Amino acid sequence: MPRRRVVAKREILPDPKHGSQILAKFINHVMVSGKKSVAESIVYNALNTVAARAKTEEPMAIFEKALESIQPMVEVKSRRVGGATYQVPVEVRPARRAALSMRWLVDASRKRGEKSMALRLAGEILDAAENKGSAVKKREDVHRMAEANKAFSHYRF
């Protein structure tokens, strides 16, 4: 953390196809070893698959609904008090909420069994939009952990 001035947030350019900043950020999360064109093709193919499977809704709406269903409201942070380490529940900032949901969606997709990453990602997006799947389970686990440690919430940061 800088001591003098606050570092300005960098502006993320919207993705070329849908014009969405959220999707551009998500493409960056999917990207491995700087291969952005590969990540873009994976995400766009996944959205095309989502559009084919769910004919009624717009694929971007399903994607945003999926991210919304994964976002955690509270998480636990370790706080050391007199030799004991407590897991203290804290509220999650909106920017971190979005980043965690994207990270969990990509991680859950990578662990799935479908053939290509685009199919895995599409499957996980559809599952998350219906409040099921590994990414939603991860959010539930984080919430459960925060609920279990509610007694330590007075050790605020």
Swiss-Prot record:
Gene3D superfamilies (alphabetical): Ribosomal protein S7 domain
Alphabetical UniProt keywords: Ribonucleoprotein, Ribosomal protein, RNA-binding, rRNA-binding, tRNA-binding
A GO cellular component entry from the record: small ribosomal subunit
InterPro entries assigned to the protein according to its UniProt record, in alphabetical order: Ribosomal_uS7 (IPR000235), Ribosomal_uS7_bac/org-type (IPR005717), Ribosomal_uS7_CS (IPR020606), Ribosomal_uS7_dom (IPR023798), Ribosomal_uS7_dom_sf (IPR036823)
GO biological process: translation
Molecular function via GO: rRNA binding; structural constituent of ribosome; tRNA binding
Highest taxon above the source species: Bacteria
A Pfam family hit: Ribosomal_S7
Assembly, per entry: Part of the 30S ribosomal subunit. Contacts proteins S9 and S11.
PANTHER family for the chain: RIBOSOMAL PROTEIN S7
Function per UniProt: One of the primary rRNA binding proteins, it binds directly to 16S rRNA where it nucleates assembly of the head domain of the 30S subunit. Is located at the subunit interface close to the decoding center, probably blocks exit of the E-site tRNA.
Family indicated by similarity: Belongs to the universal ribosomal protein uS7 family.
Protein name: Small ribosomal subunit protein uS7
